[in-house]
Amino acid sequence: MEKNEFKFTIYFYFLPLMVVCLSHNLNSKMHRDNMRNIAFLLGSTLFLTTQVQADLVINGQSVAVNTTEQKILDLNASNNFQMCIANLKTQAMNSGVSSSTFDRYTQNLTPDYSVIEKLNYQPEFSTPIWDYLSGLVDIERIELGKQKIQQHRDVLNKVSATYGVPAETVVAVWGVESNYGSISGKNDLLQSLGTLSCEGRRQSFFRGEFFAAMRILQRGDLTQDQLKGSWAGAFGHTQFMPSTYEELAVDFDGDGRRDLVSSTTDALASTANFLKKRGWQTGQPWGFEVKVPEGFSISGESRRNKKSLSSWVERGVVRADGSPIIQANLAESSQAGLMSPAGENGPLFLVFKNFDAIYSYNAAESYALAIAHLSDRLQGASGFVKEWPTNDAGTSRTERREIQAYLLSRGYSIGDVDGLIGDKTRQAIRQEQMHFGLSPTGRAGQLILRAIRDQNAKKMMK
């Protein structure tokens, strides 16, 4: 922060107080006292400004401000948040939230600004596709998913019969969203959604979710303690947003409540209902990997630019194993788009309307591909035929835990060995990549894993 910037900040906070003093009956007997108050405030302001400037500039460089400024900034941020929340009351009431409900759940609400940072970093948009998929569709998740299918076979059979969505697809959503219910989020939804309603981008969207969360509590579907989830407001086994819950959640176990938190049955059925309502076509595939003839141009092709399978056949497109693309329940008139998530040198896919239904769950092609691929693997299919165009492929969660264990042994403070790559792990990886002479990308890829294994092997031989 520059000197002048902070001087303006101090004046900004104290000027209203000075104006109040000036405007308070200047002709009264208190005039003289008011002027003394103003002089005191001006002196305090100048003192604070000078004091903070001395702290801010050391050797010509900006450093951390003192606690006085921080307290002022924190107070102002808190006041701004409370003012924003109060201004939302009319809008909330127009959406069906009662005055008493709004007051009850907002009177002690405080902001959580960490969610703003997460809003600006979403791995499905910023992580290389091979990293994203390797962590979500690994042997560990595949095997556990198969166990879950067997464990919930009766319920899944009923769900599939009711909604026409395969058990493997429903369970794949469950696996990607919460690792089959084991990681559903610990954020207080009202705090997260309240903050996102007043800060950052997409405030209008998050306000709708904020009000929906209060309506859920108002109806008594869930308690506030149960309404915990992701930083963005998704909750339960299959991570529904509050408005999606209101629209599509179902009471499949017949207990009179739509419970995506404690009832696996309700969660699985609600997920199938979601996909059905978003256009899932029973008996049709989501898509499949294909290969194209040499010289084939993918320019202009996309998931949205769908064409008949007969037109793709005419252009020489076949399945990745070389077999014809028109098989089973597919017709020449079936519509599919060509998707190339890593460009022409990576795997290519023809995708149908069922892929779009999955995509609507979370609008990212990498996310939809993770669920689609996991559903195939749960049915016994193998991995993609064509490799991703990288010399540093992604790692599984087991391999990521191996990397984290090594980093801990090197003295890095990165938290638990859980296979989840956060900022601290990425920073530590960058340091080790430089140590090994690798490009400091911060990625938990195969190159750093091999370097670690080589290092450990050398230690074992000594």
Task: List where the protein language model places each region.
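Bacterial N-terminal signal peptides that target proteins for export
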Residues: 5-8, 30-39
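N-terminal secretory targeting signals
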Residues: 35-109, 410, 434, 450-462
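Short acidic, glycine/serine/threonine-rich helix-capping segments at coil-helix boundaries
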Residues: 395-400, 408-452
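Catalytic glycan-binding domains that act on GlcNAc-containing polysaccharides
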Residues: 97-333, 346-351, 355-375, 379-397, ...
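Aromatic (phenylalanine/tyrosine) cluster motif
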Residues: 6-14, 47
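Low-complexity, intrinsically disordered or signal/transmembrane-proximal segments
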Residues: 11-13, 24, 31
